[in-house]
From Swiss-Prot:
Belongs to the shikimate kinase family. This is Shikimate kinase. Its EC number is 2.7.1.71. The keyword Magnesium applies. It holds the Pfam family SKI. GO terms for biological process: amino acid biosynthetic process; aromatic amino acid family biosynthetic process; chorismate biosynthetic process. The keyword Kinase applies. GO terms for cellular component: cytosol. ATP binds at residues 14-19, 120, 156.
Length: 173
């Protein structure tokens, strides 16, 4: 990669965005930023608390401001929250300011990776698998809409996915 363009990772919860993002940033010598972590740091509270207090709408407004700010940086690998693509504004800034990588995963793998994670407010339901299926139905077309590259992450290590991303980005330029 001659120039260090921004790389934005999108996809559902449990796709590996944060893990792969850290690996990718390390391999490229770039800064890694997790938008959810920045939201929590700025709010002084975790996401489930923000959801409880402000609802999903309040959280999404925070997320929109943070993503707009973070995408103005140069040479970063940014991992976004699974629902960030619900905002047209987020989709626009992600598309305009970097290379968008959609990390795709099956609902089965998502469920396996997230079932013990209590920090996922949208999964604190009677039937989390059904919730994941409903989210996928709405969000997957939005991920596909803005993705420059799509990669399946189900049975691959973070290092292997990061290596594939680097190869594919090199081919884009």
């Amino acid at each position: 990669m001659a120039e260090k363009r921004n790389i934005f990772l999108i996809g559902p919860m449990g796709a590996g965005k944060s893990t792969i993002g850290r690996q990718l940033a390390q391999m490229l010598g770039m800064e890694f930023i997790d938008s959810d972590a920045v939201i929590e740091e700025r709010a002084g509270a975790d996401i489930d608390w923000i959801f409880d207090l402000e609802g999903e709408t309040g959280f999404r407004k925070r997320e929109e401001r943070i993503i707009n700010e973070l995408t103005q940086n140069q040479g970063v690998v940014l991992s976004t929250g699974g629902g960030s693509v619900l905002s047209k504004e987020n989709r626009n800034v992600l598309s305009a300011r970097g290379i968008v990588i959609y990390l795709e995963t099956t609902v089965d793998k998502q469920f396996e990776r997230t079932q013990r994670d209590k920090k996922r407010p949208l999964l604190q339901t009677e039937n989390p698998r059904e919730t994941l299926e409903a989210l996928a139905k709405v969000r997957n077309p939005l991920y596909e809409e803005i993705a420059d590259i799509t990669l399946q992450t189900d049975e691959q290590s973070a290092k292997l996915v990061a290596t594939h991303i680097i190869e594919l980005i090199d081919n884009l330029q």
